[in-house]
C-alpha cells in the first residue's frame, strides 16, 4: 500500500504519528491543515475564523481536495494528514485518531509550537476546539454528505487520550504492517477511561465489546467485564469489536 490517510480530532496527535511513520518508512507527508493555515493567513484570519468563513463556500475545500485526489492517483508513497483524505484517496490505509476534548485542550494549550492556534486561557481553547469541530462536521456534511464520526470509514481507529506516544506510534505502525501482509489486527482501540458504563451492569464475561457512540460519548452496550478488567489492570487501550455511530 503506497498511501496512508490520517484523519482525526484536533490535538489527537496526527502530526506526531505521521512524523513517526516517515521515520520508519520511505513516505512523505502532505498536510491539508498546512494548506488551510496558509490560506487562512493569506486572508488574515485564524484557523477558526477561516473555517467559519468557508462553511458556505466550497471552493477552498475543493482546492485542497483536488490536490489530495491528484496525488492519490500516483504511486508515490504519501501520508495524507487530512480530515477528508480517506474519501478522496480510497486506495489507502485509513487511520482515525480520537481524543477527548479535555485532553485535546491540555495538549493544544501547552503546545507553544502551535503559533496559529495559541490561546490566552484553557477555557477559550476548549470552546474553540468544540466550535471548530462543529464547523468542520457541518461543512463536510453539507459539501460531501460525509460523516467523519462514522467509524466504518476507517481501517484503524485509535483513542490517544490516555495512551503514551510510543504506544500509539507502535500500534499504528504494527497495524499498517499487518494490513499490508493480510494479517489480522485490532481495528478499534479505545481508552477504557473513555467508556461509560451504566450502573448495575450484568456480568457478561466472554461477550464482545460493543460501544454505542452517542452525542460524542462512548456508552458500553456489551462487554462490561472486559472494560472493568482493562481498568483494573491499568490498560491505556482496550480492543473494541463494534462501535455503533
Which residues are covered by each model-predicted region?
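Conserved phosphate-donor/acceptor-positioning beta-strand/loop module used by diverse small-molecule
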Residues: 91-115, 119-128
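Short alpha-helix boundary/capping and kink motifs at helix termini
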Residues: 177-219
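Conserved glycine(s) of the Walker
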Residues: 13
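A short, basic-hydrophobic beta/loop patch
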Residues: 205-245
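ATP-dependent small-molecule kinase phosphotransfer cores
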Residues: 32-89, 102-103, 114-117, 134
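Hydrophobic positions on the alpha1 helix immediately C-terminal to the Walker A/P-loop
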Residues: 17
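Hydrophobic anchor at the beta1->P-loop junction of P-loop NTPases
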Residues: 6
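Small-molecule kinase domains that catalyze NTP-dependent phosphoryl transfer to phosphate-bearing small molecules
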Residues: 117-168
